């Protein structure tokens, strides 16, 4: 097995998620410590949190807000957000983001109040 992985995100399927739709690279590999997602946030996302995962968001397109533990923070392209485990969060508005979960995304670590 090579010492690298390659993903063509434009060839990955869109998957429904609490934020809209996502394409997830490296989420199904046991060899990754992180995954990379391109997320199209269609509407206001559903508030959720993670007990284990840290997430790093990078806004690519759109102007909106992130709700972080109840506080609304304005975001625009090239805004980066570091979301630690336990932080209740959601995007507000139509955005396109890159999401890097660490460790790699696990749908069992997605919690809703």
Residue ranges and their predicted role:
Residues 1-34:
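A short, N-terminal "cap"/entry segment at the start of jelly-roll beta-barrel domains
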Residues 23, 66-68, 97-99:
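Short hydrophobic/aromatic-rich beta-strand segments that constitute the beta-sheet cores
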Residues 35-51:
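Conserved short histidine dyad/triad with adjacent acidic residue
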Residues 37, 60-61, 76-77, 93:
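A cytosolic small-molecule/anion-sensing beta-strand core signal
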Residues 43-45, 79, 87, 95:
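Surface-exposed loop/turn positions
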Residues 52-64, 69:
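Glycine- and acidic-residue-biased ligand/ion/polar-headgroup-sensing regions
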Residues 70-86:
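Short acidic-glycine-tyrosine-enriched beta hairpin
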Residues 85-110:
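Ligand-binding loop in jelly-roll beta-barrel domains
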């Amino acid at each position: 097995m090579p010492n690298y992985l390659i993903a063509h995100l434009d060839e990955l399927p869109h998957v429904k998620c609490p934020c809209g739709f996502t394409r997830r690279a490296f989420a199904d590999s046991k060899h990754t410590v992180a995954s990379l997602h391109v997320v199209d946030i269609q509407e206001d996302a559903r508030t959720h949190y993670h007990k284990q995962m840290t997430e790093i968001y990078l806004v690519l397109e759109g102007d909106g807000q992130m709700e972080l533990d109840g506080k609304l923070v304005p975001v625009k392209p090239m805004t980066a957000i570091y979301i630690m485990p336990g932080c209740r969060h959601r995007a507000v508005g139509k955005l396109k983001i890159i999401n890097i979960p660490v460790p790699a995304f696990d749908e069992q670590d997605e919690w809703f109040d």
